[in-house]
Amino acid sequence: MFKCKNFNYAVFGNPINHSKSPEIHSLFSKQTGISHFYKSCNVPLNSLYAVLQDFFKKDGRGANITAPFKQEAYFFCNKLTKRAEVAQSVNTLKKIDNCNILGDNTDGIGLLSDLIRLNFIKKNYSILIIGAGGAARGVLFPLLSYGCSICIFNRTVLNAEKLVLQFHKYGNINVFNTNSLHVKSFDLIINATSHFIQDKDNFIPFSCVSSKTCFYDMNYQTDNTFFFDWSRKTGSNFFSNGIGMLVFQAAHSFFLWHNVLPEIDYIIDLLNK
């Protein structure tokens, strides 16, 4: 049976080789002086439950969950934070005792924290989110709670409609319709897809953006991406990748486990080099 052992904290996903989480948590450990043995584990598909059970039965104290397991991890937990319960998606687990695993979702607070750091967001901002998958699901509740209005653009409209139905009680959220042009340009556009939509004939009209629109890619590649190239064509100079979100969500996971929130900014600068 697949096993992870000899450490207390881990990130589970498939694939996982690209993960920067072990590096980030190593920096947190050195900074805070908290012993924090953290590794990455590639989990075979359909094996998450068995892997997590084995991990927590041994020395496991906390775990991060990445694609494609966040919604599956939600059902593994028997206690949930409010934001995890609303998102129905979990990226952080904490062992409370031998019988209870707490599930949290720090993706949304991670994104919101980075947007505030960048001065990319204000209350009442109009936000367009590209994508209606797990990445979008995890961030909607904090953005709506902050007071922003959200439109979701997704090629499969039904998936966007499902998210709107799930989250409409928490704020102003709608499906973006390219046939009904937005009168006012968006203040912020967030790419929540792993592969940015490249079909120019089936995308967002430039009438919906301005030179003041901010662009945020939840992916954290430092090289130019299609989303980056598209944002530049709008005339905007406000663009960021998702490195800051990655570090902030990791910091909030660390806080859940140790009740200490690490310093953030220098780690973001380090990873962006």
UniProtKB/Swiss-Prot annotation:
Binding site for shikimate: S19, K20, S21, T66, N91, D107, Y220
Pfam families documented for this protein: SDH_C, Shikimate_DH, Shikimate_dh_N
Positions bound to NADP(+): G131, A132, G133, G134, A135, M218, G242
Annotated GO MF terms: NADP binding; shikimate 3-dehydrogenase (NADP+) activity
Gene Ontology CC annotations of this record: cytosol
GO biological process per UniProt: amino acid biosynthetic process; aromatic amino acid family biosynthetic process; chorismate biosynthetic process; shikimate metabolic process
Top-level division of the source organism's lineage: Bacteria
SUPFAM superfamilies the UniProt entry points to: Aminoacid dehydrogenase-like, N-terminal domain, NAD(P)-binding Rossmann-fold domains
Active site (record annotation): K70 (proton acceptor)
InterPro entries for this protein: Aminoacid_DH-like_N_sf, NAD(P)-bd_dom_sf, SDH_C, Shikimate_DH, Shikimate_DH-bd_N, Shikimate_DH_fam, Shikm_DH/Glu-tRNA_Rdtase
Catalytic activity: shikimate + NADP(+) = 3-dehydroshikimate + NADPH + H(+)
Top EC class, one word: oxidoreductase
Entry keyword annotation includes Oxidoreductase: yes
Summary of subunit composition and partner proteins: Homodimer.
PANTHER family reported in the protein's UniProt record: BIFUNCTIONAL 3-DEHYDROQUINATE DEHYDRATASE_SHIKIMATE DEHYDROGENASE, CHLOROPLASTIC, SHIKIMATE DEHYDROGENASE
The family this protein is said to belong to: Belongs to the shikimate dehydrogenase family.
Function: Involved in the biosynthesis of the chorismate, which leads to the biosynthesis of aromatic amino acids. Catalyzes the reversible NADPH linked reduction of 3-dehydroshikimate (DHSA) to yield shikimate (SA).
Protein name listed in UniProt: Shikimate dehydrogenase (NADP(+))
